[in-house]
Amino acid sequence: MLGLKKSFCFLIAAAIIFSTVHFISGCAMTYNGEMLFFSEGCSQCHSFKGKGGRMGPDLSAVTNLRSDSWIDRYIINPTDINPLARMPSFNHLSNSKRKAIIAFLKK
């Protein structure tokens, strides 16, 4: 019986640690995405929750309308999706940087 209690306690502790690490890494990714949104120039054209430019569309609800993979493809090469897009390609951004920006947009 004591062995079961130890195993159960271990599983609970592992779950708490895993969820905390996952939460912290998610917060870090969102923070990095916010920094990238402003440092890479996204905010010069796009606004997000009232901050940023007005030339491009407001991105506050973009993750409700488009999938992560669609947003990622659009960041890489907008004219592949919309030949009339005025947004430049951001294909120089690494996969992890694009994911961080998308995580920020989900905030």
Please annotate each region the language model reported:
Residues 1-25:
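Sec-dependent bacterial lipoprotein signal peptides
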Residues 40-43, 57, 69, 85:
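Glycine-centered loop/turn positions within well-structured domains
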Residues 53-62, 76-106:
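Axial heme c-ligation environment in periplasmic c-type cytochrome domains
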Residues 33, 39-48, 71, 101:
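The canonical Cys-X-X-Cys-His
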Residues 38-39, 47, 61, 89:
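Phosphate-coordinating loops and pocket residues in cytosolic domains that bind phosphorylated ligands
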Residues 19-38, 57:
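Electrostatic cytochrome c docking/interface patches
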